[in-house]
């Protein structure tokens, strides 16, 4: 018989009798793992007392996998089997990654996905990321002395549905239970906010190795509320390295590079970038030829990239509806914020000094560990509530190729929101549901996420059916959609798990286009809505005439048909006003007919019944 042990209320639990949970910063360049130990969030070191694990793997012969620092030397000697910056490939299609510049890997198309051809076989980005997560998991279990119960894993705030799902899949493959996916700037804000205790509105500027995020948050009485987010999931330190790579190739007039030479230049360029943060120039040998770049030239090249981040920052401030003067602190996160020009230009934008005092490499992992502790139910003096937001609007296609937005961008998540729709035609027994993402008014200008069908709708007159469609976005930012026909109770649902998702360029373009074409979109939407109404009116009139033509004399019938044909002839034109007038004329010509049909229906309903029955 198993006995349950219950300790005395006054006894202190032994260390690690509670659940062991961790926070992981799965970065483009480096990854870290942290845990709350004795009430303090601390980064867990490896056996060499190193905090960071370089996000690099080498696939060797005889299935020998090397992760982290030990994999670096292979980048030069075996570049096609040494994968760096795998985070950039997460949730991407083959078409998207094939546009990446200076890519030394052998990529294989597998449906919508991309595989890396290595000596260990064809591997996906999910599998490669899983090996990095597995290494961090092993480090944590060795240090904490037990089996982990779960982890909070951070992702860029601007990661789309596919990229988030890929991250969760990688964790599952690594044997990690994902307690929550947490946006990187939010994690940084948690660590900073609890450390400083300073309430108010803060901006988190997060420029990492491969991604950029900007978040505007309000911290008040233990509640972190994200007001707005922005970013670019394909802009980071790697792009600053590319500036030096391209300058080197141009300066030395290099026409072609082997994969090994490309990896060598990449490593030297990264070192040069870091050197220029402290010195006026950097030089190295490129294919046995000397190359030198000055700090001034690098900053001239880098300004273009930094300005891109500032444009996104301004947009986030507008979305948050806050005055820049009311933002108390600008917290700099991510290794790329060590570039002096980045801090200088961000400081100029906000007209105040930025906070660089916290370790930009460790703060995200520490914040994730704090949140993991809370989700595991481990009591703390600093329990907090995180309220994150959705980066882009979600909606459905309606008649006329229009988009009906169900959840708008920058809405706090998790959230459930529902809306009722109806049928367009008499006797319609099925409905096709098309889920979209974006800010524009028309389907053709938004991104398709999924399509599914609802069958079994009872046949009835158009407009009588009631279909409730519910959108649910969880705390990880993942979407599921359900549809229920209210009368029959027939139901269908789908979890949105696309094999690849939006590139950040597409996201940024969606937002820009939503502003540039706002007026045109509204006019186009109005035209399409009027056209839909015209078609609905024509179908209703045709159906009524087919059933009750005998009620009409020749004159009334001709008047209705003339008005109907006039509308039919212009329904696909671009003249919204003319269509509206034609609809009104047709409805006016049918007033007597509608009255006659109503009277007929009433007479049929009361025929053979007495007053006491009503």
UniProtKB/Swiss-Prot annotation:
Gene3D superfamilies: 1.20.1270.10, 3.30.420.40, Actin, Chain A, domain 4, Substrate Binding Domain Of DNAk, Chain A, domain 1
Pfam families linked: HSP70
GO biological process terms on file: iron-sulfur cluster assembly
The keyword Transcription is assigned to this record: no
Keyword Chaperone among UniProt keywords: yes
UniProt keyword list: ATP-binding, Chaperone, Nucleotide-binding
Source taxon at top rank: Bacteria
Gene Ontology MF term list: ATP binding; ATP hydrolysis activity; ATP-dependent protein folding chaperone; unfolded protein binding
Disulphide bond pairs: none
Family (UniProt): Belongs to the heat shock protein 70 family.
Main function: Chaperone involved in the maturation of iron-sulfur cluster-containing proteins. Has a low intrinsic ATPase activity which is markedly stimulated by HscB.
Listed name of the protein: Chaperone protein HscA homolog
Biological source species: Vesicomyosocius okutanii subsp. Calyptogena okutanii (strain HA)
């Amino acid at each position: 018989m198993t006995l349950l042990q219950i300790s005395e209320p006054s006894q202190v639990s032994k260390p690690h009798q509670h659940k062991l949970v961790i926070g992981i910063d799965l970065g483009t360049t480096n990854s870290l793992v942290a845990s709350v130990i004795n009430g303090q969030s601390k980064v867990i070191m490896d056996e060499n007392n190193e905090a960071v694990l370089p996000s690099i793997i080498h696939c060797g012969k005889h299935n020998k996998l090397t992760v982290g620092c030990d994999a670096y030397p292979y980048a030069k000697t075996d570049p096609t089997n040494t994968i760096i910056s795998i985070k950039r490939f997460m949730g991407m299609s083959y078409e998207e990654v094939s546009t990446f510049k200076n890519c030394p890997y052998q990529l294989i198309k597998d449906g919508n996905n991309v595989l890396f051809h290595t000596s260990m076989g064809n591997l996906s980005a999910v599998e490669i990321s899983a090996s990095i997560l597995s290494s961090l998991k092993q480090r944590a279990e060795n240090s904490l002395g037990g089996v982990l119960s779960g982890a909070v894993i951070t992702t860029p705030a601007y990661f789309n549905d596919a990229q988030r799902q890929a991250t969760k899949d990688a964790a599952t493959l690594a044997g990690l239970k994902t307690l929550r996916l947490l946006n990187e700037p939010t994690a940084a804000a948690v660590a900073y906010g609890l450390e400083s205790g300073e309430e108010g509105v803060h901006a988190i500027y997060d420029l990492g190795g491969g991604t950029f995020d900007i978040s505007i948050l309000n911290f008040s009485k233990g509640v972190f509320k994200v007001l707005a987010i922005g970013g670019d999931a394909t802009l980071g330190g790697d792009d600053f390295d590319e500036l030096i790579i391209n300058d080197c190739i141009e300066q030395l007039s290099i026409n072609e590079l082997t994969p090994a030479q490309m990896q060598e230049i990449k490593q030297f360029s990264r070192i040069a970038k870091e050197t220029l943060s402290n010195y006026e120039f950097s030089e190295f040998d490129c294919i046995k030829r000397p190359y030198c770049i000055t700090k001034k030239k690098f900053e001239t090249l880098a300004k273009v990239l930094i300005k891109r981040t500032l444009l996104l920052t301004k947009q986030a401030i507008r979305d948050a509806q806050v005055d820049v003067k009311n933002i108390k602190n600008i917290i700099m996160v991510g290794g790329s914020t060590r570039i002096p020009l980045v801090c200088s230009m961000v400081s100029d934008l906000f007209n105040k000094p930025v906070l660089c005092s916290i370790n930009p490499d460790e703060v995200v992992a520490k914040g994730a560990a704090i949140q993991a502790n809370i989700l595991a139910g481990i009591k703390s003096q600093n329990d907090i509530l995180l309220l994150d937001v959705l980066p882009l609007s979600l909606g459905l296609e309606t008649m006329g190729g229009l988009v009906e937005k169900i959840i708008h961008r920058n809405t706090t998540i998790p959230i459930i929101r529902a809306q009722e729709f109806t049928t367009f035609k008499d006797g319609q027994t099925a409905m096709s549901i098309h889920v979209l993402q974006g800010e524009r008014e028309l389907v053709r200008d938004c991104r398709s996420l999924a399509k599914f069908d609802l069958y079994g709708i009872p046949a009835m007159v158009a407009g009588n059916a009631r279909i409730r469609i519910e959108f649910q976005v969880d705390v990880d930012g993942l979407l599921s959609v359900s549809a229920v026909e209210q009368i029959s109770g027939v139901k269908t649902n789908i979890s949105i798990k696309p094999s690849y998702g939006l590139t950040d360029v597409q996201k940024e373009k969606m937002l820009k286009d939503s502003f540039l074409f706002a007026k045109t979109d509204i006019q186009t939407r109005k035209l399409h809505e009027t056209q839909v109404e015209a078609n609905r009116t024509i179908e209703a009139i045709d159906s009524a005439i087919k059933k009750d033509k005998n009620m009409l004399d020749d004159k009334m019938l001709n008047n209705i048909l003339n008005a109907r044909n006039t509308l039919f002839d212009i329904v696909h034109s671009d003249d919204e006003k003319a269509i509206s007038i034609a609809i009104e004329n047709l409805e006016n010509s049918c007033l007597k007919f509608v009255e006659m049909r109503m009277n007929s229906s009433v007479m049929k309903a009361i025929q053979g019944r007495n007053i006491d029955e009503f």
